[in-house]
């Protein structure tokens, strides 16, 4: 029996050693290609269909974080250099707030437990711009908070593009970076409105979707 177990482990180890490099060699270039394609596509959409682009982009941000799709910084930095402002980076802020609201609403429907405590703490951390613990720990396993966060983000993204909210510097998409939205006009006050829309939308949608734990 021990020989059989040892043989099975040996086969699995060999399979892993063969398949892992093949997977990484295929997945890494594919992920890079997908990221470049999405970046170019959204850059075009934001130029030609602002509110729709805002809704779509902000709505899928949780998925891009979960799957590790990156590459937006190049467009954001180019916008800041050429235009003096950027409209893509703020969407990550709105999405973070929507995730916060969705996860905290889910926590309110749960009985006291370690998972509920984790949801509250990670939901609050989202406001600072760190969503991975909330996404991987609560939203993705529970599904409904993820859907609510995506819906809330979409609403906020469309609202922001309709109001023309932009950032004037590259920064962490969290509450500590709100000074980068200050200008001589009312951009900052529009930001506050979109922030409220993002958090409240994520919270309300999640609260309605999730049943109270008995």
Indicate where each model-derived feature is located:
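Transmembrane alpha-helical segments and their short flanking loops
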Residues: 79, 133-214
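Hydrophobic core segments of alpha-helical transmembrane domains in multi-pass membrane transport
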Residues: 15-25, 58-63, 98, 102-105, ...
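Short, small-residue-biased leader/transition segments that mark boundaries at the very start
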Residues: 3-10
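Helix-loop-helix junctions within the multi-pass membrane cores of secondary transporters/permeases
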Residues: 77-153
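Short helix-coil transition sites and intra-membrane helix breaks within transmembrane domains
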Residues: 26-31, 49, 64-72, 94-97, ...
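Hydrophobic alpha-helical segments of integral membrane proteins
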Residues: 7, 30, 34-49, 59-63, ...
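Membrane-interfacial loop-to-helix junctions in multi-pass transporters
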Residues: 11-14, 42-56, 84-91, 111, ...
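Transmembrane alpha-helix interface/packing and boundary motifs in multi-pass membrane proteins
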Residues: 57-70, 83, 106, 125-128, ...
